[in-house]
């Protein structure tokens, strides 16, 4: 078993986990509400903790000579479940209602979004179990990958947005699977599958960056039907919605709207603002 490849693979896994966790804080704030951003932290803790218990239970059935294959399988599962969780998040928008349907959607989001962290945790836990004699080196690569993921997030988020970061994470996780698979003899199938998955995810990132086919269509219970401009930054998603004849609005995370109009004197948007201000002054 090639230990350097295992170490590099773990670095890619932890890099991917931190990028995913932090990008989910932005995605949850845009698709749901800002206080749900902190749910990403609990998801990471829940998934990682569950993976530790799982590996502890099944580790005796995992033959040491097949460690590379199991690590590669965990990395591929991380990549695939990540795409699945993104689909669930985007197709189950929360609303202002408090009925059972809304709670069911939230449960689906929580369960699906925890899966990538579970499989990533399985890879890290299994590597620590099998390479306990070199835990200092493994932990070094673990922390280095996590730190690099945090540093890369802001420039990459500004460049391609939170949704494409989630897709990019799948490519990086699958690339870790390539390293894991090639670290052990007899893991050619796992290596090839991981490589194909990494390339496919990379192509999907490039395609979606130019077409925006995978994007937020409904947020906070409202359809986004007239988006003129959309851009992610390190702390929010900015959209411009409406039409230039009646006026447009700039929104932060599908909320906090600010109206813009060509004709400020006759704008219905500004009239609403003046009416609201007049009502406020009468109350006070």
Segments the model singles out, each with a brief description of its role:
Residues 1-284:
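Alpha-helical transmembrane segments of multi-pass membrane proteins
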